[in-house]
Amino acid sequence: METSVSEIQVETKDEKGPVAASPQKERQERKTATLCFKRRKKANKTKPKAGSRTAEETKKHTPEAGGSGQRQPAGAWASIKGLVTHRKRSEPAKKQKPPEAEVQPEDGALPKKKAKSRLKFPCLRFSRGAKRSRHSKLTEDSGYVRVQGEADDLEIKAQTQPDDQAIQAGSTQGLQEGVLVRDGKKSQESHISNSVTSGENVIAIELELENKSSAIQMGTPELEKETKVITEKPSVQTQRASLLESSAAGSPRSVTSAAPPSPATTHQHSLEEPSNGIRESAPSGKDDRRKTAAEEKKSGETALGQAEEAAVGQADKRALSQAGEATAGHPEEATVIQAESQAKEGKLSQAEETTVAQAKETVLSQAKEGELSQAKKATVGQAEEATIDHTEKVTVDQAEETTVGQAEEATVGQAGEAILSQAKEATVVGQAEEATVDRAEEATVGQAEEATVGHTEKVTVDQAEEATVGQAEEATVGQAEEATVDWAEKPTVGQAEEATVGQAEEATVGHTEKVTVDQAEEATVGQAEEATVGHTEKVTVDHAEEATVGQAEEATVGQAEKVTVDHAEEATVGQAEEATVGQAEKVTVDHAEEATVGQAEEATVGQAEKVTVDQAEEPTVDQAEEAISSHAPDLKENGIDTEKPRSEESKRMEPIAIIITDTEISEFDVKKSKNVPKQFLISMENEQVGVFANDSDFEGRTSEQYETLLIETASSLVKNAIELSVEQLVNEMVSEDNQINTLFQ
């Protein structure tokens, strides 16, 4: 058998009726009968559709042409295009000749088989649709029509099957031309109705029975085919002649093995026999057409049956399965071998060479897809495992951090209790009071404030302050206060207020540990504070400060200031300012000043008040301003007579920004100040301003007096601002009235 070059064309033409007829008839009868019958009956109807019907006719004749000789892939393309044009001319000749050799009138060189004459009878329906435009075309390229029939067969298979199966089937179709031809006939008939216009790209598949390999070539549109048809006709004829000789020995075996033995072998022999005589019988195509016309009409009516459908279905399945098995293992080798053999013969054109390269790439890509799918699966599995491991690690780390944080909180609470007990025991000793007061206060207050600012401060400060103050203040108030205030308040309070509680506590602990810190307190304070300062302050301060800042600060500051004002102010004011700067500082400063002046500042009022006032002025002034601004309407009513109603003023009131600079009272000149209330000036004159000048530390002033001074100053500023705003409003109202009057005038 000659290797047939089949091309898959996507065309839209009306061959649905013949499609039903051809699959039912045998493949041989299908190719010839459907083509012939359609051409004759549908010649007038399907002239615009002749391209697709000619493709079907060529598909039917392809088994004959395939048996007679192989065509180059480029030749197949060109031949198909040429057939489309020649079919219109020579389709009637093909219809008559297919029983002998359908395509004889067009290309005498191309073998036209009598076996196709049988096929032409069922193909009469197809020929009806194709007669219009294909009769004239088929006369010139009957051999090419056969090639196209095989190409159409491959088209249907490629469309019905996945691309992979189509490629594999194409590789073994050289061995299975008989089966493929039958399958192609069915597929051609069924596929042409659903096919796309002939202008689309076509895939040409060359089948070589001798090499048992197939090359899938991607072809250009029919324009290239038409140009190449004329040049390739002689080469195709010579190829078919050579293939017929060689295929006589080797092809029958492959055909019988690939396709059902009885239909495939009989069809192949029938194709081989007429192929040699097609050239000779080309001139007698007209007589054959006339004879076959009557036969096709009769056979077209009776040949349609269910037997062909079953046979074709089985043949297609077998052909596809065998093609898949044959090409599954070595699709690339078959393609390469065929390409090389054709290149040696000089039959491949440039377009064909490119299509061979593309076919190789497609085969390689498909072969790689299986490997890639497995590699992807392995990679995905590994990625998932790594992700799961990473997620588990992160989860475990988070869980551990949470657990550690909770454990540290509990540890700090227990450590605070242990420290309190140790502090109480240590403070009982009279000689250790100086060092113990500083150490116990710092360790106890620092840890208690950090761990549980709300509850721990109440318990810890109450117990520690009661024990420490009771025993320590009587014995060592003078020494402890002097040493503590000089050594701790200035550096520690300054750092605590300016920086953060963490730095203040580190500095305080560093100094206290130098004196005499017990081993338990050292380990507990060092580890507990370092480990839990970040976590406990965030959690505890947020919750505890909001709920119990007022009560905790009152109790803590009130008792802590008795013994060590510096430590209480460091821990309390530092944390209070960080947690709730607005409310906590207000409460802390108020209570700190009251407790400091009332209980503990008898010995060190000068130094303590200097630091306290400097630190307390900022929050106190801000709070005073807020309080005064909230009571601004009352101030308006009491001290200011407004010329306009309040409703109008409130509507037009613009925001007033009051800025109070931080200045030490020693630098504050009451006489030069314009905004100081008169009452304050009178009181200052009575008390003699020299009191401030005599002592830079303001020992004669209490915190209450400083607070009242700040409040009065702020209130005076607010009053002045309100007066100015009222004046502006009045001026604006007057100007508006004047403008209105001018408009009326």
Curated annotation (Swiss-Prot):
Motif (AKAP CaM-binding): 74-94
Localization per record: Postsynaptic recycling endosome membrane; Cell projection, Dendrite; Postsynaptic cell membrane
Major localisation: membrane
Comp. bias (Basic and acidic residues): 54-63, 90-100, 180-189, 222-231, 285-300, 535-546, 633-651
Residues bearing PTM Phosphoserine: S4, S22
PTM characteristics: Palmitoylated. Palmitoylation at Cys-36 and Cys-123 play a key role in the targeting of AKAP5 to lipid rafts. Palmitoylation by ZDHHC2 is required for AKAP5 function in LTP-stimulated recycling endosome exocytosis.
Chain residues carrying a lipid of type S-palmitoyl cysteine: C36, C123
Superkingdom per UniProt: Eukaryota
Subunit structure: Binding protein for dimer of the RII-beta regulatory subunit of cAMP-dependent protein kinase (PKA) and also for the protein kinase C (PKC) and the phosphatase calcineurin (PP2B). Each enzyme is inhibited when bound to the anchoring protein. Also binds the beta2-adrenergic receptor. Part of a complex containing AKAP5, ADCY5, ADCY6 and PDE4C. Interacts with ADCY8, and enhances its phosphorylation at lipid rafts. Interacts with ORAI1 (isoform alpha) (via N-terminus) upon store depletion and in response to LTC4. Does not interact with ORAI2 and ORAI3 paralogs.
Protein name per Swiss-Prot or TrEMBL: A-kinase anchor protein 5
Gene responsible for this protein: Akap5
